[in-house]
Amino acid sequence: MKIALENMPRSPFSMATTPQALSELMDGIDIGICFDVGHANTMGLIDGFLELKDRFVNIHVHDNMGATDEHLPVGKGTVDFPRLLGGLSGYSGRYVIESRGVDDAVQSQRELRRLLA
């Protein structure tokens, strides 16, 4: 079994909102990262979290406009998915699509597959 910590958007109850905070929490512990793309985008920290990609166990995929955690379909917000996926070169784990409904999930799946092809 592999345990992972998820990066979270800024809130009074979040521990791991920055790459540095997440790295410090994991220091010396055999634990992975559940990388949430949308959460990182709300903090403007996608590139910083990509520096920790060797510890990614899975990736939560959704888009937003950069201010709040909207769970928009892939390609409908401000996440630069081609750049993100380029930064994930060599990643072989799971992508978990997060959406507000089935139609949005299917749309995200199609777009993600297109980008990964």
Regions found by a protein language model. Name each.
Residues 1-13, 35-38:
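Aromatic-lined carbohydrate-recognition surfaces of secreted/lumenal glycan-active proteins
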Residues 15-34, 40-117:
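Histidine-acidic metal/acid-base catalytic patches
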